[in-house]
From Swiss-Prot:
Keyword set, alphabetical order: Cleavage on pair of basic residues, Hormone, Secreted, Signal
Keyword Secreted: yes
Family matches, as InterPro entries: Motilin_assoc, Motilin_ghrelin, Promotilin
Keyword Signal in annotation: yes
Region (Disordered): 39-74
One Pfam family matching this protein: Motilin_ghrelin
Family statement drawn from the similarity comment of this UniProt entry: Belongs to the motilin family.
Record GO terms (molecular function): hormone activity; motilin receptor binding
Residues spanning the signal sequence: 1-25
Name recorded for this polypeptide: Promotilin
Length: 116
C-alpha cells in the first residue's frame, strides 16, 4: 500500500500545479535597463531599414505604376506546408448561421452537379 505521507505529498504537488496553471504570473526575464537597450536597438534597426529603402528608391527612380516590374510579374508563391482553410463553429453558432451556410453550400454544390 501507499503510505499516507506519499499520498499527501502527491496531493499537495497536484494542487500546486493546478494553482500555478490557473494563475497568470509575470516573471521578468530582462531588467528595465536591458529592455530599454533592446528597444533602442530595434528603433535603430527600423531607422536603418527605412534609410536603405529610401536610398534604393532614389537609385532606381520612379517606376511606371501601370506596368509592374518583371520580378513581380513572374513571381510564384510555393507553399512548403499544407494549409487548412476552414472555420470551426460551436453548436450555438451553427444554429445561428445554419440557413446562411445551407444557402452557400447549395450555391457551390449546384453548379458542380450541373457540370457533370
Amino acid at each position: 500500500m501507499v503510505s499516507r505521507k506519499a499520498v499527501a505529498v502527491l496531493l499537495m504537488v497536484h494542487v500546486a500545479v493546478m494553482l500555478a496553471s490557473q494563475t497568470e504570473a509575470f516573471v521578468p526575464i530582462f531588467t528595465h535597463s536591458e529592455l530599454q537597450r533592446i528597444r533602442e536597438k530595434e528603433r535603430n534597426k527600423g531607422q536603418k531599414k527605412s534609410l536603405i529603402v529610401q536610398q534604393r528608391s532614389e537609385e532606381v527612380g520612379p517606376l511606371d505604376p501601370v506596368e509592374p516590374p518583371e520580378e513581380e510579374e513572374n513571381e510564384v508563391i510555393k507553399l512548403t506546408a499544407p494549409v487548412a482553410i476552414g472555420t470551426r463553429m460551436n453548436s450555438r453558432q451553427l444554429e445561428k448561421y445554419r440557413a446562411a451556410l445551407e444557402g452557400l453550400l447549395s450555391e457551390v454544390l449546384l453548379p458542380a452537379r450541373n457540370d457533370k
